[in-house]
Amino acid sequence: MLKAKRILIAAGGTGGHINPALSVAGYIRSQDPTAEILFVGTADKMEAKLVPQAGYPIKMIDISGFRRDLSPAGIVHNIKTVSKMFKSSSQAKKIIEDFKPELAIGFGGYVSGPVIRMAAKLGVPTAIHEQNAYPGVTNKTLAKQVDAVMLTSMAAEKYLEPKNPCMLTGLPVRAEFFTADKARSRLELGVDSRPLILSSGGSLGAEPINRAMVELIAARAPKGDCCFIHATGHSGTWVTDELKKRGVDPDKFENVTIREYIDDMSRCMAACDLFINRAGASTLSEIEALGKPSILIPSPYVAENHQYHNAMTLVEKNAAVVIEEKDLTGEKLTEEVEKLLSDRAGLDKMGENARAMCVSDAAQRIYDCLCKVVG
């Protein structure tokens, strides 16, 4: 059992950092219900809502990242960021001195920097978890100072200079991604025996993906030989009207379902034969858990282009195909889909390769690593 009774967790900015942190916090609590867990985040990011919703207390510090443009606004922002760096270190020190943690864990995001750095300086055992195949700036710096570096993919190791050897732990995935059954999921969704293509433009609705999917659905749906579930995202509500203009009315085509969001992702992914999506770390871990072949379209708008590096870990194992957004067209996507669907054995092999990459006991591995850190 983890000897630490008071655990400080720093995670923020995006769900990609926060959700793994919440998963690990939940696992720690499952092993020791008396453990005191305190999160540290920033007031204007997702953690301010997600962490309290999950039932954990959270303290806030004032921190932001640097902008890379040299516009007047960018320069002003960066000057303020330097000021916040000094302020956030003082805030982190006070939180640590008040809470007196016996272990501090960073899951990425700018907030992890001052918190984990200060914890290490004050002699608190420390660990970080890197979700992506290309580490963020914060974790690159912290790796030199912390007691343990945990990785989702060993591809990240070559970009780090850790004080101690890195440990492969994988990324925690919700249990339903391991238990969802394909036949039952298809029955619940009303999908017959035809191949099902599941796709998403992300929560906001990436226009290049939505436009390419309109082309693909317009080309393939009238043939009636496959089914589609596509999530447009918040800004993609135009997709249905565009499909209607092209002669594909989702209300009249029983093989086409258009949603704004997919809130039953484990069921839809279990049911599908091919998944088209971005390449965030959590998404890839879910793909691996369910063993699904995929076409990945990495977001070019993320730090260090890390989604491309994430995607390439699957491509190198013949578990996925990558189309960069700059190369994405409806024609190219349609061509790739038709090529994959025409080779069922090859498609199944891609899924098997994805499943072989899965670290199914990620939460346990992280917990075991933390036990070693505390001693």
Model-derived features: positions:
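C-terminal alpha-helical cap of glycosyltransferases
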Residues: 359-375
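Acidic donor-binding loop of glycosyltransferase active sites
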Residues: 101-103, 266-284, 292
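Structural loop-to-beta junction motif characteristic of Rossmann-like glycosyltransferase folds
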Residues: 56, 124-125, 273-274, 291-299, ...
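Conserved nucleotide-sugar phosphate-binding/catalytic loop shared by glycosyltransferases and other
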Residues: 4-14, 31-87, 169, 201, ...
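Glycosyltransferases and closely related glycan-assembly transferases
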Residues: 91-104, 111-127, 140, 144
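Active-site-proximal region of nucleotide-activated glycan assembly enzymes
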Residues: 38, 46, 57, 120-182
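Donor-nucleotide binding loops and adjacent catalytic segments primarily
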Residues: 50, 182-275, 308-312, 316, ...
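A short, well-ordered alpha-helix in the C-terminal region of glycosyltransferases
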Residues: 346-360
